[in-house]
Amino acid sequence: MKNWSTRVNDAVARSIVGRRFRLEGSGHRRERKGARFLTEIRAGLTTFFAMAYIISVNATILTDSGGPCVCTDAKDPTCKTDIDYNLCLNVLKRDQITATAAISALSSFCMGLFSNMPIALAPGMGLNAYFTYTVVGFHGSGPVSYGLALTAVFVEGFIFFALSLFGMRQWLARAMPKCIKLASGVGIGLYLSLIGLTYSAGIGAITGDRDTPVTLGGCVPSEMVDGVCPGGAKMRNPTLWVGIFCGGILTCVLMMYRVKGAIIAGILLVSVISWPRPTTVTYFPHSALGNDSYDFFKKVVTFHKIESTLVQQEWDLGQAGGQFGLALITFLYVDILDATGTMYSMARFCGAIDERTQDFEGSAMAYTVDALSISIGSLFGSSPVTAFVESGAGISEGGKTGLTAMTTGVCFLVSIFFSPIFASIPPWATGCTLILVGSMMVRVAADINWRYMGDAIPAFVCLAVMPFTYSIAYGLIAGILTYALLNTLVKVVEVLSCGKLVPENKEFRDPWTYKVPGGVLPGWMRRLARGKRDFWREDDEDELGGAGAGAGAGAGAKAGAGAGSESQVELDGVVKGGLRVKPLSASEEFDKLS
């Protein structure tokens, strides 16, 4: 006899919702294996809890820009002690909490609805810091005003929209060398783990050091000396151990025993432990900041209307000179690599990549929603919106369709009214979650071609630079430049030596060409050119039709092999004892464990 969850999953799968989102059992010719309604809901909740910290963290960072608040104190140009200015900042922070939750809700819901991908969007970490501390400056001390910076973000979004509409972003992701695409997933996993170890968004196990880039932390923040934990105080912070044992070890054990919702359980348990005040692990210490946070937490249900950040764009571009253009270009190249790399890695993590075309279903809509969300977010007063690597938390819980992202969007919508609760999830509650997700993502390192240095070195540079520069974009840039330089030099040497000087193991290299299957033009343009009236709908002649993902992977492997040796066939597998063995993908391996 079927239990209630199976009955619900089967009923939804047979409905129009099941066919729309291609749930398992829906009868859709491209239904996604393992995609079940209740699993998608749980995955969406997991993604939300993993990235709920962005509500308070993004608001805190953007408040440091000063927003539209005006500082007129000549003696104190940053107005740190100006009462009126700081009161304005308090209003600004509440505005940013509402704005962050609102744009995250809208963008994540639309991403799931239109692209059917389990990828959530929100104002990006790193981009918000660049926006605040480099472009606008602390309390408006930078070269560009808050309004002009928002204008740069607004324009950037529409440039992205054009690039997405005409297929350039999709082509960039598909034309990227395979070793770089695989390494980006590993690098993002390491990047997530590093975030999970920090104080700002993790358990606080590491800090910076005077002599080394990072060192062991774990002390109470008040005991730090110049941002470094003294020797005797390291690993003495009670919140660190609550995060490790309740948010990490317990979650791992639950996952080992296949307990559904293990990640959510860990986050909720640590949060509940951290809310009471008279404890050593409280998130609300008896300080000015703690009192203010606790007063906000006690409201539980409230709605704060945005008062100061709506539509603050300034269009007098001459006042900033070249600084406006510099900010726009920087936002463009950082965001295009960051978001494109993240989306591709998340699509691979959930098993949605077609190995034949190196694209994923709904990519055009995914990139378009991302682009429009950037411009809409700027109208709310926010820094650029981007795909969140924390989406991997939901994917690791089994999320495979847009229902996951839509659930996350609904949670962000609810959080607008319950912002005191969701803004009070401590970073040590989600830190171990990020580390666990990172550990799942680095498994694709086994698929990187380590035998040929022309592929291995660029891949390693990419995955190493990402966490240590705290930037996905910089890692991709470093990896791509290294790949181009090494392989160009190899080609030059071969030409000059008439093919006599060939690097070791070159026959094992991954094939690459800029002529990707399907060409540069997006699917909707090709369908329109064929005279298809409903050109926005995919059909059997699309690059993702016909063979499907599984056959596509095999076709891609054979196409890459050419007429050469057996080892060249091995695009997505390893050779053991003369036989080619195809490893499980990350999503397949998780399904097996679940």
Task: Give names to the regions the model predicted.
Residues M117-L121, A262, A339, S382, ...:
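Conformational gate/switch positions in structured elements
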Residues M1-T6, L521-S594:
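Intrinsically disordered, low-complexity cytosolic terminal tails
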Residues G137-L269, M406-E538:
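Membrane-embedded alpha-helical modules
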Residues K2-N3, V57-N58, G66, I103-M125:
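Juxtamembrane transmembrane-helix boundary signature
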